[in-house]
């Protein structure tokens, strides 16, 4: 369905405010709409507006595409007036308010929007696509025209082979890190072919990128962008060597980890893939994966495989607790198999006690204790 709608939701009488349909003008790029819009505020040319930010959606050519190739629709980011439905701004690879030459793959996931100074107005957008790319778009509130929003591709984790044709169907989770001299936004996301959950060819991964450009300005006062990060600039944390009992192995891992732009984990079980957004809480990353059943013969068959839950350190991908209760914290403690079959939904958090929030993965829940120091800081 190439349309978007927004309604006034009253207790008894909800009503549709407007409907947006793709196919012409600036909305030619609007594909199948999969994700929830992000509702926020921006100051556009001195006027504060309620806005709806959405990705361009999905191009169903991705359903059976084994190699990475440009999409016809979906490769856009739209900002609409949330009160009237009018298009305020959009980005794509051409014929847009912000042309980004690398924005050539569809964007079905939710746009992650950051209000860095808690003034109610959005400042940054993080955008992931089905080409395995990640973009950051920066909003300069109060400006207009070409000065209103700038952006760039900041990572490319896809490739041009069947094995490296990684796709992001879901938006990242993002949090600010300020530890001594280290200032960056931690951007966490995982790859997986949602349209073909039973695929076992693509080598999918989970990534945590350190985006330091949001703390640096150029001579014109604009936020900076790192040169596009690829896996070669990331630390492969799969072996859990940073916590090795072997001193030499640990030292080599620490040297390899130093000055990297983040880390990633190979999803090593055959066909394992991420099919939901992660959740960052208390400097830990929760995410789920899906492992297809080996015996299935149809790429479109109902999912009957299993799901796994990961809990890792946001800083380095290490395990953070003794999950299997064997008295040691090692690589095996990153993940646990879920009882539920099929594809697990996104991680949700329920907060009744701020120190012990409950994290739920579908129907299975666990308490996540947040450590607080004597000054009350977590």
Show the residue positions of the predicted features.
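Beta-propeller fold recognition
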Residues: 4, 8-378
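Glycosyltransferase donor-binding loop in the core domain
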Residues: 1
């Amino acid at each position: 369905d190439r349309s978007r709608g927004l309604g006034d939701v009253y207790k008894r009488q909800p009503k549709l405010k407007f409907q947006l349909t793709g196919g012409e003008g600036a909305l030619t790029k609007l594909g199948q709409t999969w994700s929830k819009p992000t509702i926020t505020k921006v100051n556009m040319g001195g006027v504060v507006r309620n806005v709806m930010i959405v990705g361009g959606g999905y191009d169903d050519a991705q359903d059976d595409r084994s190699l990475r190739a440009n999409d016809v629709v979906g490769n856009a980011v739209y900002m609409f007036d949330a009160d009237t439905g009018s298009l305020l701004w959009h980005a794509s690879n051409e014929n847009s308010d912000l042309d980004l030459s690398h924005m050539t793959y569809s964007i079905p996931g939710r746009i992650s929007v950051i209000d860095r100074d808690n003034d109610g107005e959005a400042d940054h957008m993080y955008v992931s696509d089905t080409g395995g790319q990640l973009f950051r778009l920066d909003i300069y509130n109060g400006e207009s025209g070409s000065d209103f929003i700038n952006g760039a591709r900041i990572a490319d984790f896809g490739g041009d082979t069947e094995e490296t044709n990684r796709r992001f169907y879901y938006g990242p989770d993002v949090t600010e890190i300020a530890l001594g001299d280290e200032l960056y936004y931690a951007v966490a996301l995982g790859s997986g072919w949602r349209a073909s959950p039973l695929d076992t060819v693509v080598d999918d991964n989970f990534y945590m990128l350190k985006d330091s450009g949001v703390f640096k300005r150029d001579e014109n006062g604009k936020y900076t962008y790192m040169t596009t990060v690829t896996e070669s600039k990331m630390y492969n944390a799969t072996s859990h060597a940073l916590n090795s009992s072997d001193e030499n192995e640990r030292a080599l891992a620490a040297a390899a980890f130093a000055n990297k732009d983040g880390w990633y984990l190979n999803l090593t079980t055959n066909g394992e893939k991420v099919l939901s957004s992660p959740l960052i809480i208390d400097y830990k990353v929760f995410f789920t994966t899906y492992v297809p059943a080996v015996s299935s013969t149809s790429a479109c068959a109902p999912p009957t495989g299993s799901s796994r839950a990961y809990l890792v350190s946001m800083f380095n991908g290490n395990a953070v607790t003794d999950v299997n209760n064997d008295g040691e914290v090692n690589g095996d403690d990153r993940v646990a198999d879920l009882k539920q079959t099929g594809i697990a939904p996104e991680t949700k958090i329920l907060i009744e006690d701020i120190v012990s929030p409950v994290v739920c993965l579908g129907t299975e829940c666990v308490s996540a204790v947040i450590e607080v120091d004597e000054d009350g800081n977590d």
